[in-house]
Structures are given as C-alpha cells and as structure tokens.
Amino acid sequence: MAVLPQVDLGHLANRDTAFVIVGAFFAWVFVVNPIYLLYFHPLSKFPGPKFWAVTRWGVSLAIISGKSHDIILDLHKKYGPILRIAPDELAFQSVSAWNDIGGHRKPGQPEMTKEPIFNEAFKDNLLGVTTREDHSRMRRILSRGFSAATFQKQEPLLKGYVDLLLSELRKRCEGGQKLIDIQTWYSFTAFDIIGDLTFGESFGSLDSGGHHPWASLIFETTRFVILANCLKRINRAFLPVLLFITPKGFGRRLKENQQLTDAKIAKRRALGASRPDYMTAMLGNDEKGAKLSDTEITSNCTALILGGAETISSALSGTTYYLTKNPEAMAKVIEEVRSAFSSEDEITLTGTGHLKYLNAVITESLRMFPPFAGASPRQVPRGGATIAGEFIPAGTSVGIWHWSMARCPDFFTHANEFHPERWLDDPRFDNDKKDASQPFAVGPRNCIGMNLTYVELRLILARLFWNFDIKLDKSCDNWVDDMVEYFGWEKIPLMVSLTPRS
C-alpha cells in the first residue's frame, strides 16, 4: 500500500493567511479606499480630477513639474471655484475665501494654522510658525525693522545700492548696443540690500557681478525643500528616495552655508542695536519682554533673505517685462517719472510715493506676476469652518493659489492683459473685483515686508526710468510662460537693451 505524502497543514495555513492579508491590502488600496474617497468622504461633494481625489500624487506631480500654477488655473476653469486637489485638500478661487482662511479672528476664535508638514522647514520663522502666540511674538519684534520711520533711516543704504546698480548697468550696456540680463542684476541688488539689512553687510554681488555661494544655495535648496514636502505629504516612507536624487555635495554645502550664516549673525550681533536694520529688531524685546531664541533669529534671517530678495527681484523683473511688452504703458510711466522731478537727487522714498501711475504699474505687475504663484495651505480647526459659503470639515487643508485668482476672468476684465489703469478708477474696469489680487496675502500673517517691497520697487524703477530707455529682446517675448515656479519663480534671463537717456 502506497504511503501518502505528509502535508504541513501549518505551512499551508500560514501561506493562505498571507494571501488573505496581501489580498485585503490591495483591495483596500485599490478598491475600498478609492470608493470611500470618491463617494463617501466628507469632501466627495467637491469636484476635481478623480485621480487627485484618491491620492496626493496628482497635485504633488503638478507641483514638482513647476507648472502647478497653470494646472490649477485650468482645473478651476473646468471644475469651478472650489476644487478638490487631494484626498484631504481643497483649493479656492473666491474673493471671500481670502478672509475666511487667513483673515483676522476674534479673541477666542481659532485661526487656521499653517499646514504643519508643508511648513515644517519654516517652523521657526514667520513663514511657517504654527501657533498664533509664537507668530504674534515674532511679528511684534520684527515689525520694528519694517516701520515707516525705519525706512527713512534706511534710505541712504538703499540709495547707495541703487547708485551701484545704475553705475554697473551704464558701464555694461555700451550705449544700448549690448544686451543685459537685467533680472540677474535685479537679483544682485535685492540680495545685497537684504543681506545688508539682515547681516550688516552685503553679499558683494553688485561689485563682483556674480551671486555669493550663500545666495546660490538658496535657489537650489528651495526646489529640494518643495520636493521633500511633496514626498512627506504623500507619505514619509518615501523620504529615503531623496537620498538617491540629492545633488552631489548638497549636504556639505548646506553645512557650510549654515556655518557662514552663524558667522555672519555672530559678527552682526557684536555690533549690537547700532543700525536701523532687521537684526536690531530681532535682538530687542516686544512690549511684553519676550525675545527671539537663537534658533528663531537664525531661521528668520534665512526667511527674510529668501522672502525679501526673491520678492523684490521677481517684482522688478515682472514689472520690467510687462512694461517692455506694453510700450504705451512704458511711455506713460517714463513721462510721469521724468516730469515729476527736476533732478535725479529729488527721486526719494517720499517723492516716489506720489507717482500714481508708477504705483498702478507695480500693483498691476504684482497681479500679473505674483512673486509666489502657488498656495500656502492652512488647516481647518476643530469644529470646521465656513469658506466661500461652504462648510469645510476640521482637518482639511485649504489654500488659494495666487495665480488662479489674479488670472480669473470672473474677477478681472481682460485678466490676461496688462492694464495699470484698472487701479486708477478707469471705468472700463469698474466691475473688477480688485481684492481678488493679494500678492502679499491677507490678515495677521500677511507679508511683513509688503511696504518695504513697494518702497524699494518705486525707488529702483523710478531711477532706472530716469536714466535709461529700455527695450526687450525678442528672445524673451514669452519670458513668463517659459518659467517654472517652486515656492517662487526659477527665473530665466530677461535680456534687454538699455539706452542711456540723452
């Protein structure tokens, strides 16, 4: 009689259990969870791409592409003003949403805090600090460096750097015969000014005609931080991927950059509160006696330079681009500047504040080309909130993409056209919802440097238009369309000819 083979029933049971577990996992990931997210999740009533509703990969890939601003605008056109861009995130294209999300709150009323993972890299500075109390403390201390009285004290410093910029442009333009990448020179100027106001010394970019390694690394770091944030918001398990895509020597350069930052801060701190700059503000107390920690000082220095320099250089470049693309507007602003002053010495912070058309040009440029085109997501607090007339459950990430607001034809007549007159009570634009454009955000967490930005832009542009006639090279006709954006524009050359005023 044949002997039957022995069967390890325990092994079969274990194998069957494994198959069940694996099968259940795949059923959950690819069937059950997507069905729940699409049809039963609290956000399922809001429209958007189905793939984006079941995974964060959709919006993450859009951000990584550098074209998320265009993609989100197109999706709003297709799906409407409230757009589901991830399983737990909504994007709004609504004027009232600005205040619903970021506006001032009554005492005891919870605010919508910065989304913690997105802002993790900025948790120790004004850009991303989470709690209302810490933000208020930082803001009170830093605001002294951005007061009108401080601007007046800073004017000689600003004037010196504008003098240097104009001198370098005059030397290099060869009477209008040689093309100049003016956005690079704007960047040099912005970094030198913000470096001086933060560290007590410039980066030397205008003198050397090149970016300091510190500034160069800022550009590289920004893209890396955005990529890391996208992976973290999908799942932190993806973070090891960064090890394989990190540029060679990046970690070493980051360490060297931190050492340089520490050295610059130590050198500036040794001078004490001796200059009308940001460090003087950061070394002080608020009215309650609160201070910034050493970590917060270091982090805010980096944030001020990143936010300040990039905002100024982007705004200068965008304004120059749109004026050179619109000769009638350029002629008007040049006429205003050159007729308002009898000599260049009269072009001051106070004097340029009265240039109505120049101010309208700057405001329109910031609408057309906001320095930050994307969204800085907030988190709906416990109990939920009403945004744009819709109840949004607690824990939802919400945001407004600057680009999608500024380019929306529901808010602006000829939304994709450059018309400074829309800010000067021109009846053609009476139906514009001008509050839709908020390049510096709204509420208690709006950009602390907004007024400084306007001050610098007016001074630099007025003196540039006083001294030069400017013409855009044809190679840059599609300058804005050719760029990508990662928490700020990754700018490409803006080639112009500068002809000294005769």
Swiss-Prot record:
Keyword annotations from UniProtKB, A to Z: Glycoprotein, Heme, Iron, Membrane, Metal-binding, Monooxygenase, Oxidoreductase, Transmembrane, Transmembrane helix
Binding site for heme: 447
Biotechnology comment: Hypothemycin is an antifungal agent that exhibits excellent activity against Peronophythora litchii, which could be helpful for the storage of harvest litchi fruit. Hypothemycin is a strong inhibitor of a subset of MAP kinases such as human ERK2. It can therefore be used as an anti-cancer drug thanks to its inhibitory activity of Ras-mediated cellular signals. It can also inhibit Trypanosoma brucei kinase TbCLK1 which is a good candidate as a therapeutic target for African trypanosomiasis. Finally, hypothemycin also has inhibitor activity of T cell activation.
Sites carrying sugar chains: 300, 451
Coiled coil: none
Database matches in Pfam families: p450
Cofactor requirements of the protein: heme
Topological relation to the membrane, as annotated: Single-pass membrane protein
Family affiliation: Belongs to the cytochrome P450 family.
Name of the protein in question: Cytochrome P450 monooxygenase hmp1
Organism name: Hypomyces subiculosus
Lineage: Eukaryota, Fungi, Dikarya, Ascomycota, Pezizomycotina
